[in-house]
Amino acid sequence: MDLEKLKNHQKYIRNFSIVAHIDHGKSTLADRILELTDTISKRDMQDQVLDDMDLERERGITIKLNAVELTYHAKDGHDYEFHLIDTPGHVDFSYEVSRSLAACEGAVLVVDAAQGVEAQTLANVYLALDDDLEIVPVINKIDLPAADPDKVKNEIEEVIGLDASDAVLASAKQGIGIPELLEQIVTKIPAPAGDLAAPLKALVFDSVYDDYRGVVLSIRLFEGTVKPGDKIRLMNSGSEYEVTEVGVNSPKPIARDYLIAGDVGYITASIKDITDTRVGDTVTSADQPADKALPGYREMSPMVYAGLYPTDNAKLNDLREALEKLQLNDAALEFEPESSQALGFGFRCGFLGMLHMDVIQERLEREFNLDLITTAPSVTYHAYLTDGTMKEVENPAEMPEASAIKRIEEPIVKATIMAPNDYVGAVMDLCQHRRGQFLTMEYLDDYRVNIIYNMPLSEIIFDFFDKLKSNTRGYASLDYEMNGYQGADLVKIDILLNGDKVDALSFIAHRTFAPARGREIASRLKKIIPRQNFEIPVQAAIGAKIIARTTIKAYRKDVTAHLYGGDRTRRMKLLEKQKAGKKRMKAVGKVDIPQEAFMAVLQTDEDETK
């Protein structure tokens, strides 16, 4: 391996991510770049090439980061090796963005020419600045009738503080501005540094399980080189393996003879034990290990917890294996076993938000052919007990008795909402209604305002974003980050069906709203739970006190239909017999609870009035 020659090649590598607010056109821009650099033939071209999950295509969003290598012949006559990493734009997947940026020297920031800078644009820029990346601004969708590139340039300079004088004006759909962007990537984004003669040091930024090759690690090399036959060590677990293949994705995997410092590619080493690998780990040489590991990533704490249960308990092990494989590919997913009296055995899973939860459930059902029931999502509460201890409560059913609790604290998020000036009142009303505490408000220009609130996470996770969009005709955008815990007057509400507590339907609410929420949920369950052959009382209770009750009426079979004329006592006897049978059935009858019932706990009365 001629290190001097390879060192020269290193000058022509460019590593960059594409970041943007959701729906600003990242994936379409990536498509055009792949097309213009002839990475993909016209025949194989399709929309959202890098979104290789069916789910991503159907929803029109990027869920997973995706790395691809392409070759660009620049105006200076040299061939450059680009490593492009496409990233998600939704707040739930910001962890994927931070992982992508750690593998790059630069970021292409895409801003919609009509929408301008939005909350998630800002959040992603701050992530890129934290990593000290060179940012290339692109104003996309300039072909839209509502496009105003000059106004957006001004916003980029005023709100973000970036020089936008030579921002690329582009339309990814029409292919306008892409050649200019590729030239700016060459001139503005620095080549990777890294000593090829130093011990191997590579960051694992993603991994996926392959049934034939074992775990495939996506890596960015910072120092040294790696080739098949090399012995490697994973610094976190200490496990050692022999490399069987190295290569790059273009976008299909292409095996290479070696990878050098600055490259973004993959390695396989017949790793069959999933627990050995962790995203953020450092790969080094087993014979000549590096002194210390790369910084890796800050651990992401789940925001939302929910129970996942197989409808068939025999599939519990299949669910465990599926979750382990998904965790490889999605480092922010957490899970641990739990059991419920109503649903049997399953797992308590931690997610970054509702979309993340939705995507995981759908991937489990599609990719692993599982049939699941998901309980209503909840957040982590801190219950301070009278004996001086503190208990973290992820499942409402595990909240201790009220008599044992001194106080309860709930997680608070700092919510940043960008909205047009005309909708300030609507945004503030919604935040106040969801127990928000106003922090500050800043007018960004003549049209838009940035409003910051402290809000309980439990009030945001389910439908706050949808409400915000409908109250502002789709113009507002939201970003939030954890901001500690705060005491609140919270109570646990139990739901009883036919006199039995259904632990999976328990939820936690603010005492002020508890009676109304109890009545609301009891009446909603009455509509959702199918009628049985016996009457079912539906009750909501705080401790031993029933705060709401309604009844699901029984089916009534006409047991006297075959009678005609004759003695009335015969009719009465049959009706009494039916009554006794129903009483017996009610004592032993099991109520079938459909999936919608678990989600009904989360809906608010506003949803009912739509």
From Swiss-Prot:
Domain named tr-type G: residues: 11-193
Membrane topology designation: Peripheral membrane protein
Subcellular location, record wording: Cell membrane
Positions of GTP binding: 23-28, 140-143
Record keywords, A-Z: Cell membrane, GTP-binding, Hydrolase, Membrane, Nucleotide-binding, Protein biosynthesis
Xref: SMART domains: EFG_C
Gene Ontology annotations of biological process type: positive regulation of translation
Family annotation (Gene3D superfamilies): 3.30.70.240, Elongation factor 4, C-terminal domain (3.30.70.2570), Elongation Factor G (Translational Gtpase), domain 3 (3.30.70.870), P-loop containing nucleotide triphosphate hydrolases (3.40.50.300), Translation factors (2.40.30.10)
Catalysed conversion reaction: GTP + H2O = GDP + phosphate + H(+)
One Gene Ontology CC term in the entry: plasma membrane
SUPFAM superfamilies found in the cross-reference section: EF-G C-terminal domain-like, P-loop containing nucleoside triphosphate hydrolases, Translation proteins
Keyword check for GTP-binding: yes
UniProt GO molecular function: GTP binding; GTPase activity; ribosome binding; translation elongation factor activity
Enzyme Commission identifier(s): 3.6.5.n1
Protein role: Required for accurate and efficient protein synthesis under certain stress conditions. May act as a fidelity factor of the translation reaction, by catalyzing a one-codon backward translocation of tRNAs on improperly translocated ribosomes. Back-translocation proceeds from a post-translocation (POST) complex to a pre-translocation (PRE) complex, thus giving elongation factor G a second chance to translocate the tRNAs correctly. Binds to ribosomes in a GTP-dependent manner.
NCBIfam families registered for this protein in UniProt: lepA, small_GTP
Protein family: Belongs to the TRAFAC class translation factor GTPase superfamily. Classic translation factor GTPase family. LepA subfamily.
UniProt protein name: Elongation factor 4
Name of the encoding gene: lepA
